[in-house]
């Protein structure tokens, strides 16, 4: 997902560079552009404009907005570092990125959505936060209105460790589904973590690499469905002990399965890894294959939400279903 950061003034450029540092740290693809060079390419996941709201509304918004369920987010940031999410705040991640950035540049968020102003979590934001299928339009309107007046029931799979959420009365059941207001059923999307590591890697290095990767995407361990790696690493103690500690299944893939992905998906290739393992990479293709195995979906319905993350001899990638 590409995020474009657009500025006009020298002060705006300085803030844009601060925002870029935050997005780089969290491993989100991003690009800083002066307004004179800025073009909408329609493959962006979000826009951060450091300028007056009126400029964005008049010059760009009509070209960006199209569908509430698919629009990229749009955030306005002024030169006091006040961030205002104005489009696709919940499903597109506008509120999430506003908070993420503000917390890291000593800024503040000005919310305009009723649920957020009142400290509540709307059902659309809930689905984004917990990686659930997207609610229907009618359900978003109904629940987000109701939650402003009273707590809404929320039933979760019993091993999920979410205890408190403002606006909801939480209970648990044995089913692998989330039920909102006793009637709205939302299917959890499968999440898989792909792992690669050098030979003889220590457990603590694998463990902390995984923890950091999950932190970067705000995913609790209990929300992960499976880990995955290549057959060459199936006896690697550092990987086995880490996966066992997290109490999750480990899916093993053959070299041929890993290599097949590179013929179908444009992934980063490492000649160094190919020289030693006979594949161009492990963590990214393993995570994608694991989601495919868990869902039986085609590759077009799967996406990487964290590209290959390297730390202390370990590589980690995270994939999930693409709605």
UniProtKB/Swiss-Prot annotation:
Annotated metabolic or biological route of this protein: Cofactor biosynthesis; adenosylcobalamin biosynthesis; cob(II)yrinate a,c-diamide from sirohydrochlorin (anaerobic route): step 5/10
Enzyme class: hydrolase
GO molecular function: cobalt-precorrin-5A acetaldehyde-lyase activity
Alphabetical UniProt keywords: Cobalamin biosynthesis, Hydrolase
Tagged with keyword Coiled coil: no
GO biological process: cobalamin biosynthetic process
Catalysed reaction, written as an equation: Co-precorrin-5A + H2O = Co-precorrin-5B + acetaldehyde + H(+)
UniProt xrefs under InterPro entries: CbiG_hydrolase, CbiG_N, CobE/GbiG_C, CobE/GbiG_C_sf, GbiG_N_sf
Gene3D superfamilies from the UniProt entry: 3.40.50.11220, CobE/GbiG C-terminal domain (3.30.420.180)
Keyword Hydrolase: yes
UniProt superkingdom: Archaea
Pfam families (alphabetical): CbiG_C, CbiG_N
EC code: 3.7.1.12
Family: Belongs to the CbiG family.
Name of this chain's protein: Probable cobalt-precorrin-5A hydrolase
Species the sequence originates in: Methanocaldococcus jannaschii (strain ATCC 43067 / DSM 2661 / JAL-1 / JCM 10045 / NBRC 100440) (Methanococcus jannaschii)
Source lineage: Archaea, Methanobacteriati, Methanobacteriota, Methanomada group, Methanococci
């Amino acid at each position: 997902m590409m995020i474009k950061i657009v500025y006009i003034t020298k002060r705006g450029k300085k803030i844009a560079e601060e925002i870029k540092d935050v997005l780089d740290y969290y491993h989100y693809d991003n690009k800083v552009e002066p307004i004179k060079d800025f073009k909408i390419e329609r493959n962006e996941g979000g826009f951060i404009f450091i300028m007056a709201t009126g400029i964005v509304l008049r010059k760009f918004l009509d070209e960006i907005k199209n569908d509430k369920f698919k629009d990229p987010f749009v955030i306005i940031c002024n030169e006091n570092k006040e961030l205002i999410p104005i489009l696709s705040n919940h499903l597109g991640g506008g509120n999430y990125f506003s908070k993420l950035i503000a917390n890291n540049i000593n800024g503040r968020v000005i919310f305009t959505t009723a649920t957020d102003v009142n400290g509540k979590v709307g059902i659309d934001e809930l689905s984004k936060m917990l990686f659930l299928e997207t609610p229907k339009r009618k359900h978003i309107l109904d629940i987000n209105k109701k939650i402003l007046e009273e707590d809404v029931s929320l039933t979760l799979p019993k091993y999920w460790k979410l205890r408190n959420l403002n606006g909801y009365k939480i209970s648990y059941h044995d089913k692998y589904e989330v039920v909102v207001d006793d009637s709205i059923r939302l299917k959890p999307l499968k999440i898989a973590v792909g792992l690669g590591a050098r030979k003889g890697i220590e457990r603590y290095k694998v463990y902390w690499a995984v923890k950091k990767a999950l932190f970067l995407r705000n995913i609790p361990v209990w929300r992960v469905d499976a880990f995955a790696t290549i057959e060459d690493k199936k006896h690697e103690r550092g990987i086995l002990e880490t996966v066992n500690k997290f109490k999750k299944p480990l899916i093993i893939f053959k070299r041929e399965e890993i290599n097949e992905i590179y013929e179908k998906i444009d992934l980063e290739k490492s000649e160094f890894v190919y020289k030693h393992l006979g594949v161009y990479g492990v963590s990214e293709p393993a995570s994608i294959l694991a989601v495919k195995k868990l869902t039986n979906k085609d590759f077009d319905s799967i996406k990487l939400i964290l590209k290959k993350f390297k730390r202390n001899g370990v590589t980690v990638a995270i994939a999930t279903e693409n709605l």
